[in-house]
Amino acid sequence: MVSADATPKGQMTVLDALKGALRTALMHDGLARGLREASKALDRREAHMCVLNEACEEEAYKKLIVALCSEHKIPLIKVPDGKQLGEWAGLCVLDREGNARKVVNCSCVVVKNWGEESSERMMLLNYFQTEQ
């Protein structure tokens, strides 16, 4: 389990890398959003990474996701804001200028398919290896 607060100096932050990686995975239809989809993907071991909203009100949701991630040894990142996670996962409507409107709160997102090689993906993988 990894907290998203740590930031390597001189590089993009972990949250910036996470945002880019989620955007790439979303374009390649590689995200499972919400508790139901995420728990199924984690249980089937289809997940490469899991992102959990720390501010989730249901403690049972958090315990389930943390338990599935630790059981299957899937990296877990916690983010502080569910609205921000919902925006990164594509649970919003974009207006003409490209700004997010009507953002839906998201409790959990699982990356099933990274999409393509990217610097954000490599940074996250290096981050997971150094935090273990």
UniProtKB/Swiss-Prot annotation:
Cystine pairings recorded for this chain: none
Gene Ontology MF terms: structural constituent of ribosome
Pfam family, one: Ribosomal_L7Ae
GO biological process: maintenance of translational fidelity; maturation of SSU-rRNA; ribosomal small subunit assembly
Annotated PROSITE patterns: RIBOSOMAL_S12E (PS01189)
GO cellular component: cytosolic small ribosomal subunit
Protein name according to UniProt: Small ribosomal subunit protein eS12
The species this protein was found in: Blumeria hordei (Barley powdery mildew)
